[in-house]
């Protein structure tokens, strides 16, 4: 049987299910997994909102790029933060990866998932229109690096089946 090539990098806007899908894929295929935001928090001993407060978004993006680089050689599956494509260095790293999977769904679904989540500094206190503007500003960059795009409004098992089928046919 053909094996799945790694790393598999999950990208997409906040609230599209990258962490959930990453964990599920990891368990399903016995592959190593890391949630990049969580990895940053553990290594920096601070929450993402506190990092944003201390060094700003630009400083956070620089940290994120550094940690992405180290995770690419260490983990089989990586779920990234939604804004990873905001940094040109991260974007370049991702462009050089073969299996970047873009999870996407309707902005109304995303809004329901992320509103009132204090752990998301770029969503906190944004209304639907403001979140949609941020979402829209990122779409072309997700598209630029994606090996495949998956509608994450489906069940996690359906999403993982689609990803597996595409990866095995590649």
Swiss-Prot record:
GO terms (BP aspect): amino acid biosynthetic process; aromatic amino acid family biosynthetic process; chorismate biosynthetic process
Record note on quaternary structure: Monomer.
Pathway in which this enzyme or protein is active: Metabolic intermediate biosynthesis; chorismate biosynthesis; chorismate from D-erythrose 4-phosphate and phosphoenolpyruvate: step 5/7
Family: Belongs to the shikimate kinase family.
GO MF term list: ATP binding; magnesium ion binding; shikimate kinase activity
Listed cofactors: Mg(2+)
Subcellular locations according to the entry: Cytoplasm
Enzyme Commission number: 2.7.1.71
Listed name of the protein: Shikimate kinase
Binding locations of ATP: 15-20, 120, 154
Catalytic activity: shikimate + ATP = 3-phosphoshikimate + ADP + H(+)
Function: Catalyzes the specific phosphorylation of the 3-hydroxyl group of shikimic acid using ATP as a cosubstrate.
HAMAP family: Shikimate_kinase
Cofactor mode of binding and number, as noted: Binds 1 Mg(2+) ion per subunit.
Binding positions (substrate): 37, 61, 82, 138
Xref: PROSITE patterns: SHIKIMATE_KINASE (PS01128)
Underlying gene: aroK
N-terminal signal peptide: none
Keywords annotated in UniProt: Amino-acid biosynthesis, Aromatic amino acid biosynthesis, ATP-binding, Cytoplasm, Kinase, Magnesium, Metal-binding, Nucleotide-binding, Transferase
Binding-site list for Mg(2+): 19
Any one of the GO CC terms: cytosol
């Amino acid at each position: 049987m053909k094996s799945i090539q790694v790393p598999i990098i999950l990208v997409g806007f906040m609230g599209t299910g990258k962490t959930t899908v990453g964990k599920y894929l990891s368990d399903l295929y016995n592959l190593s997994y890391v949630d990049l935001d969580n990895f940053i928090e553990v290594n920096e001993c601070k929450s993402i909102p506190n990092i944003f407060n201390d060094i700003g978004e630009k400083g956070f993006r620089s940290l994120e790029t550094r940690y992405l680089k180290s995770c690419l050689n260490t983990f089989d599956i990586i779920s990234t933060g939604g804004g990873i494509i905001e940094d040109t260095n991260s974007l370049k790293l991702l462009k050089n990866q073969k299996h970047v999977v873009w999870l996407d769904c309707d902005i109304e679904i995303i809004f329901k998932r992320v509103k009132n989540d204090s752990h998301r500094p770029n969503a906190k206190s944004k209304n639907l229109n403001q979140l949609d503007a941020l979402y829209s500003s990122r779409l072309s960059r997700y598209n630029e690096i994606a090996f495949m795009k998956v509608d994450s409004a489906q069940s996690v098992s359906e999403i993982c089946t689609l990803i597996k089928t595409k990866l095995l046919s590649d």
